[in-house]
Amino acid sequence: MAEPLLVVGLGNPGPNYAKTRHNVGFVVADLLAGRIGSGFKAHRKSGADIATGRLAGRAVVLAKPRTYMNESGRNVGPLAKFYSVAPADVIVIHDELDIDFGRIRLKFGGGVAGHNGLKSVAAALGTKDFQRVRVGVGRPPGRKDAATYVLEPFTSVERPEVPTICEQAADATELLIAQGLEPAQNLVHAWA
């Protein structure tokens, strides 16, 4: 039997961060947990909250690190080891400043573009070669600091679109699992 895929939604714990741009990974992970009919529970050995089940015919471990974003690898590394998941079988769902608001992009490996959550995961896995579901939050307006921007709630104009965007990111994750990177990219990257 194949080892499970590890699907990690990045975010910050606690209600103060729940509706921020940086937490779209958590929102998508919650949607995926609903799709597999599983709730999150604490995983003692890793410190993350996990839900297990099947997505697109594959065994998956969904995870939400309980550390702050910049230390996500502290939970992801031990989880990957515990479940014997190779880095290439890790899918990280995260916010992306370099993609326009509402766009979803799939990627394998490459740089971390200043995203400290990705940097922490890459350090814990010992490689940047893992799969990513990138949820576009766009660049901050004017001269606003990017670190401040991602920790702010979505604007009143953006907020009504967020549930649909997160559902699309969950759909993209399922396509990635079902079809592999290139076929899923061809479909997802064509979405308006």
UniProtKB/Swiss-Prot annotation:
Transmembrane segments: none annotated. It is found in: Cytoplasm. Belongs to the PTH family. NCBIfam families: pth. The gene is pth. This is Peptidyl-tRNA hydrolase. Hydrolyzes ribosome-free peptidyl-tRNAs (with 1 or more amino acids incorporated), which drop off the ribosome during protein synthesis, or as a result of ribosome stalling. Catalyzes the release of premature peptidyl moieties from peptidyl-tRNA molecules trapped in stalled 50S ribosomal subunits, and thus maintains levels of free tRNAs and 50S ribosomes. The lineage of its organism: Bacteria, Bacillati, Actinomycetota, Actinomycetes, Mycobacteriales. The record marks N12 as: Discriminates between blocked and unblocked aminoacyl-tRNA. GO terms for cellular component: cytoplasm.
